[in-house]
Amino acid sequence: MEGVVLLHKPKGMTSHDCVFKLRKILREKRIGHTGTLDPDVTGVLPICVGRATKIAQFLTSETKTYEGEVTLGFSTTTEDASGEVVEKQDVNRTITRKEIEAVLAELTGTLEQVPPMYSAVKVNGKKLYEYARAGQEVKRPVRIITIHEFTLLDNRETFEGANISFRFRVTCSKGTYVRTLAVMIGEKLGFPAHMSDLVRTASGEFQLHDCVSFEEIEENMQNGTVESVFISIDEALSKFPKIVVDEKQAEKIKNGMFLKNEIQAETPFITVFDRNNHCLAIYEHHPKRPGMLKPMKVLVNNQELKL
């Protein structure tokens, strides 16, 4: 049993909870997720099973797309709806669509972001949420993130009320804290804010409409059709730049042979496939030999090599 399961993560579960539950359903220990989703967030969570755990690190590097809701009027300890209220300030003026769109435009591009205290980022060997739960504030590292697209989904021209909510879509780089973006939006509009709802609709090429629920996985497990919920390793990696090698080269790949970067791809890594469209290995740019590639992860051995 191996491959990638596109789980439609339910609300209220951590990513670790999802892995634990899937281990019980599939009766498989080698399972790992491809990036943390907060308990309040639902949506696309790719989970690697069996030999596919070898490729988890390559699936986490993909851009993510979310649809969510920002609420102005109060902020929380966790920057989302699950936290305790920290600051309250009624929205005492009309906010226009143009104002919000201008803020979203300002937050598009390369930004600096400080991760929230309630997060899994480690400082001095401890996760930030461990400090937060102990009532300790520590200096947090600044991250460089990229917001590729930030769109207002609400079609109203004006927003009024003590608490104002509006929906958005954002496509961003790995490591972006979208709930922190909600706080940043509030700051620029002059009011405390938090993320009141969030759904991950895409992780790289993986889309929400392709995801399956725990119930569907359990049903397929009982019916003996569980393989239908898996995406193969080859398919999961097929969207990345690739080099196709012949039989002679394929035989040498498993021994870590260097390759020429024949396609001149500038991406961090390049996949290597045989002529039967089977992924043999994942390569990266050689740090000392320009134009050459060296193996990062070999996915085949003598028994697994399929030619």
Curated annotation (Swiss-Prot):
Chain coiled-coil ranges: none
InterPro entries to which the protein is assigned, alphabetical: PsdUridine_synth_cat_dom_sf, PsdUridine_synth_N, tRNA_psdUridine_synth_TruB, TruB_C
Keyword tRNA processing found: yes
Record GO biological process: mRNA pseudouridine synthesis; tRNA pseudouridine synthesis
Keyword tRNA processing tagged: yes
Domain of life of the native organism: Bacteria
Keywords: Isomerase, tRNA processing
TM regions (residue ranges): none
Recorded catalytic activity of this chain's protein: uridine(55) in tRNA = pseudouridine(55) in tRNA
Function: Responsible for synthesis of pseudouridine from uracil-55 in the psi GC loop of transfer RNAs.
Family: Belongs to the pseudouridine synthase TruB family. Type 1 subfamily.
Protein name: tRNA pseudouridine synthase B
Annotated source species: Bacillus cytotoxicus (strain DSM 22905 / CIP 110041 / 391-98 / NVH 391-98)
